Design a protein with these regions (language model features):
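Basic polyanion-binding and macromolecular-assembly surfaces
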Residues: 1-45, 56-358
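Short, conserved phosphate/pyrophosphate- and ester-handling motifs at nucleotide-, phospho-/glycolipid
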Residues: 48
Length: 358
């Protein structure tokens, strides 16, 4: 399936970490998971939204540009509750994260609906194969018992009244109890940790990457914003249906996007569960089927029964970039320490060669 898209698949190593946090009761704490019925396993994933946010953060960092300002609307109800409203983004492609990430603004008294679909289609980061990933559980403790003079203990009785030091001491002696400066956190409140080989996929729509529609039937921009962008150097295509980003800005964003695609990292939810999540291999092509076959897993029944084996394959129509760390997981491969640098340079050349005006 060849289209005017650039397809990127990445293979990453994940070790004892947390991706997305999940809201809910204590039995749904700390990690988003899904069930793989064919292999009867629950596996963790990093949501497409988190991957997208991480890539756009890397792009903004490479550009040394702050992300577009967002207004978070709140409504104070009659009973004193603060209710969430729709966040307002500026809907302005002048910001790289808006141009690449898209926007949506619902109809209001001041404006009509405007919506831009992102030219980046981004998958969740999920296991290369359910048998090549897993979850580990652990409990935790919040411990200050090494310095009891510095840390106090407050005890209240059944009525909620704070007990005096004498009352606490009497209770401890009469009941043969201790009062440690320690809080035990069971594993069902800590949540599982993910490990294994993970993949992500990105499709870059080259037809829409640097163009914004001027169509007012399904508007991406209002007329005032179209006029403002033209004054800032954006040009109309020959048919007048799209605005095209200025060449100088295109070149800067291409460099930053290539960096984001090759060097993005999950930066949230890892204060106690940091994993470098190194990229082991990247596959790049204009054909989605080729990148998914270049980095894949094969089933084998040799030895201990059904197992999955990671495969890195090279063939016509796909460029594969393999780092030395990949040799710890895949046999029979050729790796280079500068492979990701080469991938970044090739992505830059690919994006520069595309035609963005029609």
């Amino acid at each position: 399936m060849s289209t005017n898209c650039l397809f990127v698949r990445g293979l990453r190593q994940v070790e004892h970490t947390v991706f997305c946090v999940q809201n809910g009761d204590q039995n749904q704490n700390g990690q988003k998971t899904y069930y793989a019925p064919r292999f009867n396993r629950k596996v963790a994933y990093s949501s497409g939204q988190q991957v997208k946010r991480s890539i756009l953060d890397a792009v903004s960092e490479a550009l040394n540009e702050r992300r577009a300002p967002v207004t978070f609307n709140k409504t104070l109800s009659a009973d004193g509750d603060l209710e969430d409203g729709e966040p307002w983004s500026p809907c302005n492609p002048r910001y790289a994260d808006q141009l690449l990430g898209g926007w949506m603004r619902a109809k209001s008294e001041e404006s009509d609906v405007v919506k831009r679909r992102s030219p980046l289609s981004i998958s969740a980061m999920r296991p290369l194969h359910p048998l090549l990933a897993g979850l580990a559980s652990e409990s935790a403790s919040y411990d200050r018992s090494d310095d009891p003079e510095q840390h106090s203990v407050r005890v209240v009785n059944a009525d909620g009244d704070e007990m005096s030091d004498e009352e606490v001491q009497e209770f401890l002696e009469s009941n043969d109890r201790t009062l440690p400066r320690r809080k035990w956190i069971p594993e069902d409140q800590v949540g599982p940790r993910a490990h294994g080989l993970y993949v992500f996929d990105v499709a870059v729509d080259l037809d829409r990457l640097f163009t914004v529609s001027t169509n007012q039937h399904e508007p991406e921009l209002d007329p005032e914003k179209i006029e403002e962008l033209q004054e800032q150097g954006w040009t109309l295509t020959e048919n007048g249906e799209h605005l095209v980003c200025p060449d100088e800005k295109q070149d800067k964003i291409i460099e930053a996007l290539a960096t984001g695609l090759t060097d993005w990292r999950v930066t949230s939810n890892q204060s106690r569960t940091f994993s470098p999540q190194p990229t082991l291999c990247l596959a790049v092509s204009d054909n989605a089927n080729r990148v998914t076959n270049a980095i894949r897993a094969d089933l084998t029944e040799e030895g201990r029964g059904e197992e999955a084996v990671p495969i890195i394959d090279s063939f016509d129509g796909v460029s594969v970039y393999t780092m030395p760390a990949c040799k710890g997981h895949v046999t029979g491969i050729t790796a280079r320490p500068d492979a990701l640098d080469e991938a970044r340079e090739d992505i830059v050349e690919w994006l520069r060669a595309a035609e963005y005006a029609a």
